[in-house]
C-alpha cells in the first residue's frame, strides 16, 4: 500500500503564522514521518508547494509597479528555506504553481475533462478607472451574512462564508476604491452537478473521514451543487487552454488542487521514474491524507473529488482530510497588521523549533477552536517535555551507566508490574498508530505522554537506585523494562520532535534512521551498549513570560530586515 501525504499549499502573499503551520504543513510533516516509520520511506510521498497565482499578488504587483513573478520568486524561496531548513519539514517535493510541470499538467487535465466544462456569459464588476474586470479579491465590500465591512469578493474573513463579488454590499475596487459597474463577459464553468451522488456515496461510506469534513461536504451536496467558474479575467495565473478563452486565467483554487497531482509527477520526473507517480494516485492501491484548515474543506471534499472523478482515470479519492479548526492567539485571531500572533520566521528566534513543534501539536485544534497562550506553552515545555520525558530519559540512561556499566541488564523472573509496562508499550504503539491514521495527531501525542508518566510512576514505585543495593535482579528488571519504554516513547515522538528524538536514540546507542515503528514493540537486547546521559530539554526561564514583550519586539525588528519585499 502506498501513502500520499499532502499539505494545503501556503499562499505566498504573507509569511505563514503558527495557525497556518499547524493546520497544514506541520501536521502533514508529523504524519509523513510517522508513515515512513510504519510503512517504509519508499512507500510514502509527501508533497506541497507555494500557491502564488491569483488576485492578491496581482493587486500587490500593480500597487508596487512590478511584475507578480518578481514578488513571488523571492517569497517562494523565503518560505521554502523556512520550511526545509528551519522547521525541518521533510517534504519529498515542495514546488510552486509557477512550475512548468504544474502549468502544463493543469492545462492538459482541464482539456481532458472538457465535457464537464461549459461557457456562459455573465455580468461582473468592472472598474472604469483601472479599466479591468474585478474578480474575487479585486472587490471588497460588506458581507451580506455577517455585516463584516472588509469582506473580499471570494470569502468573508470573519464568518468564513464563500462569496462572489455580486453578493457584496457596497462593493469597491480593491485597487482604487471606486465603486464598480457591471459589464458582460464570458467565462468557463466546471459543472459539479453530475458528481453530487458519487460524492455523497463516497463521503457517507468512508470509515476514516472526520465528522467536520463529512458535515461540510454533505451540506454542500444537500444544498445542490452548481457549476463553478473555472476562469478569471486577471492576467497572473495559468492561461486558460480553451478555444476562445484568450486573456483568461484558471481560477487559483482549481489549479492549486491539481497541484497535488503535478507535484507527485514532478517528484518522480526528478528521480527519472516518471511513470511511478501513478502508483501514488491509483484507486485501491493508495491511502491519501490531506492536511488543511477547516475553511478549505469544500475545495478538498467537493471540488477535488469531482475533478478526480471527471478525469475518468481511476484516481484515488482522499482517504482522510484532516481539517483543523482555528488556532487563536491569546483569545484573538491572528492579525499581522495589529501584531497579534507569532509568525513562522519569528518563532525559531524565541525558542527551539522542536519545542514549537511539540507544543503546537499539543494545541492542535482537532475537535474545536483552540487558544494558544504563553502560560500553557511554557507549561507544556517545562512540565511535559522537560519533566515527563526529559527527566525520565536522563534518569534511566544515568542508572544504566552507573549500575550496569552502560549495558542493558539481563532480565530474570519479570514480575507482573514489569510485564504490565512492557505490554503497555506495545498497546501504546498500536493506539498511537490508530490515532495518527485518523488524523488525530494531538490525541496520539497525548497517549505517548501517558506512557511517559506511567513509566515515571513505575520507576518511582520500583526505585532501582535503592533496590540495586539489596535486590540487583529487581533493579535489572526495572531498568531493562524502562529502557525499552523510553525507546518506544522516543520513536513515537520522533514525528513530532525529530531532532530531540534523535538525541534520545543516540543516548540509547541506537540509530533512528534504521528504525521501524513496530520494532519498538520488542525490548532492547540485554548487553546492548547505551550512550552517555545528557540533558535533552531545557526549561524556559522563570522570567520568560515577564520578558516576553521585550523578546518579541527584538525578534520582530530582526525578522523585518530579513523578509523579502512582498512579505514586509
From Swiss-Prot:
The job of this chain, per UniProt, is described as: Is required not only for elongation of protein synthesis but also for the initiation of all mRNA translation through initiator tRNA(fMet) aminoacylation.
> What Enzyme Commission number(s) does the record list for this chain?
6.1.1.10
For the motif 'HIGH' region, give the residue ranges: 10-20
**UniProt cofactor note:** Binds 1 zinc ion per subunit.
Q: What is this protein called?
A: Methionine--tRNA ligase
Q: Which GO terms describe its cellular component?
A: aminoacyl-tRNA synthetase multienzyme complex; cytosol
Q: What is its main location?
A: cytoplasm
Residues noted as binding Zn(2+) in the record, renumbered to the chain: 143, 146, 156, 159
Q: Which CDD domains match?
A: Anticodon_Ia_Met, MetRS_core
Q: Which Pfam families match?
A: Anticodon_3 (PF19303), tRNA-synt_1g (PF09334)
Motif 'KMSKS' region extends across: 333-337
Question: Which cofactors is this protein said to need?
Answer: Zn(2+)
Whether Nucleotide-binding counts among this entry's keywords is yes
Please give the catalytic activity noted in the UniProt record: tRNA(Met) + L-methionine + ATP = L-methionyl-tRNA(Met) + AMP + diphosphate
| Keyword terms | Aminoacyl-tRNA synthetase, ATP-binding, Cytoplasm, Ligase, Metal-binding, Nucleotide-binding, Protein biosynthesis, Zinc
One MF term from GO for this chain? methionine-tRNA ligase activity
Compartments reported by the entry: Cytoplasm
Residues that coordinate or bind ATP: 336
Species whose genome carries this gene: Metallosphaera sedula (strain ATCC 51363 / DSM 5348 / JCM 9185 / NBRC 15509 / TH2)
Amino acid at each position: 500500500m502506498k501513502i500520499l501525504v499532502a499539505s494545503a499549499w501556503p499562499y505566498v502573499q504573507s509569511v505563514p503564522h503558527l495557525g497556518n503551520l499547524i493546520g497544514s504543513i506541520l501536521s502533514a510533516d508529523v504524519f509523513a514521518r510517522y508513515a515512513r516509520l510504519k510503512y517504509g520511506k519508499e512507500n510514502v510521498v509527501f508533497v506541497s508547494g507555494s500557491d502564488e497565482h491569483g488576485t492578491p499578488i496581482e493587486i500587490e504587483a500593480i500597487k508596487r509597479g512590478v511584475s507578480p513573478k518578481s514578488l513571488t520568486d523571492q517569497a517562494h524561496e523565503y518560505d521554502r528555506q523556512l520550511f526545509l531548513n528551519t522547521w525541518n519539514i521533510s517534504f519529498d517535493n515542495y514546488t510552486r504553481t509557477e512550475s512548468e510541470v504544474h502549468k502544463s499538467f493543469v492545462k492538459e487535465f482541464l482539456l481532458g475533462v472538457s465535457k464537464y466544462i461549459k461557457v456562459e456569459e455573465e455580468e461582473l464588476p468592472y472598474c472604469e478607472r483601472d479599466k479591468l474586470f474585478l474578480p474575487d479579491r479585486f472587490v471588497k465590500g460588506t458581507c451580506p451574512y455577517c455585516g463584516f465591512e472588509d469582506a473580499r469578493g471570494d470569502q468573508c474573513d470573519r464568518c468564513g462564508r464563500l462569496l462572489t463579488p455580486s453578493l457584496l454590499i457596497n462593493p469597491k475596487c480593491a485597487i482604487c476604491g471606486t465603486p464598480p459597474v457591471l459589464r458582460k463577459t464570458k467565462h468557463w464553468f466546471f459543472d459539479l452537478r453530475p458528481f453530487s451522488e458519487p460524492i455523497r456515496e463516497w463521503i457517507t461510506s468512508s470509515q476514516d473521514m472526520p465528522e467536520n469534513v463529512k458535515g461540510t461536504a454533505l451540506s454542500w451536496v444537500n444544498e445542490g451543487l452548481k457549476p463553478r467558474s473555472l476562469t478569471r479575467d486577471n492576467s497572473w495565473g495559468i492561461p486558460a487552454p480553451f478555444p476562445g478563452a484568450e486573456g483568461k486565467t484558471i481560477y487559483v483554487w482549481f489549479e492549486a488542487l491539481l497541484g497535488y497531482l503535478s507535484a507527485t509527477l514532478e517528484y518522480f520526473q526528478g528521480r527519472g521514474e516518471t511513470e511511478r507517480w501513478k502508483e501514488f494516485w491509483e484507486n485501491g492501491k493508495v491511502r491519501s491524507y490531506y492536511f488543511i484548515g477547516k475553511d478549505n474543506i469544500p475545495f478538498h471534499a467537493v471540488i477535488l473529488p469531482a475533478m478526480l472523478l471527471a478525469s475518468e482515470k481511476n484516481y484515488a479519492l482522499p482517504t482522510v482530510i484532516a481539517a483543523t479548526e482555528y488556532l487563536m492567539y491569546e483569545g484573538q485571531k491572528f492579525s499581522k497588521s495589529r501584531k497579534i500572533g507569532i509568525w513562522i520566521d519569528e518563532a525559531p528566534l524565541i525558542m527551539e523549533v522542536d519545542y514549537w513543534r511539540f507544543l503546537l501539536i499539543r494545541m492542535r485544534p482537532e475537535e474545536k477552536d483552540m487558544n494558544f497562550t504563553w502560560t500553557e506553552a511554557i507549561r507544556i515545555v517545562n512540565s511535559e517535555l522537560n519533566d515527563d520525558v526529559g527527566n525520565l530519559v536522563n534518569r534511566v540512561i544515568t542508572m544504566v551507566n552507573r549500575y550496569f556499566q552502560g549495558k542493558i541488564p539481563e532480565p530474570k523472573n519479570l514480575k507482573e508490574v514489569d510485564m504490565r509496562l512492557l505490554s503497555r508499550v506495545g498497546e501504546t504503539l498500536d493506539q498511537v498508530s490508530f490515532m495518527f491514521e485518523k488524523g488525530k495527531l494531538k490525541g496520539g501525542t497525548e497517549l505517548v505522554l501517558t506512557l511517559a508518566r506511567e513509566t515515571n510512576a513505575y520507576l518511582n514505585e520500583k526505585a532501582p537506585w535503592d533496590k540495586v543495593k539489596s535486590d540487583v535482579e529487581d533493579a535489572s528488571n526495572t531498568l531493562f523494562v524502562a529502557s525499552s519504554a523510553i525507546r518506544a516513547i522516543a520513536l513515537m515522538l520522533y514525528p513530532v520532535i525529530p531532532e530531540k528524538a534523535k538525541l534520545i536514540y543516540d543516548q540509547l546507542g541506537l540509530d533512528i534512521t534504521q528504525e521501524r515503528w513496530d520494532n519498538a514493540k520488542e525490548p532492547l537486547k540485554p548487553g546492548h551498549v547505551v550512550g552517555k546521559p545528557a540533558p535533552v530539554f531545557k526549561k524556559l526561564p522563570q522570567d520568560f513570560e515577564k520578558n516576553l514583550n521585550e523578546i518579541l519586539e527584538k525578534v520582530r525588528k530582526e525578522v523585518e530586515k530579513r523578509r523579502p519585499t512582498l512579505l514586509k
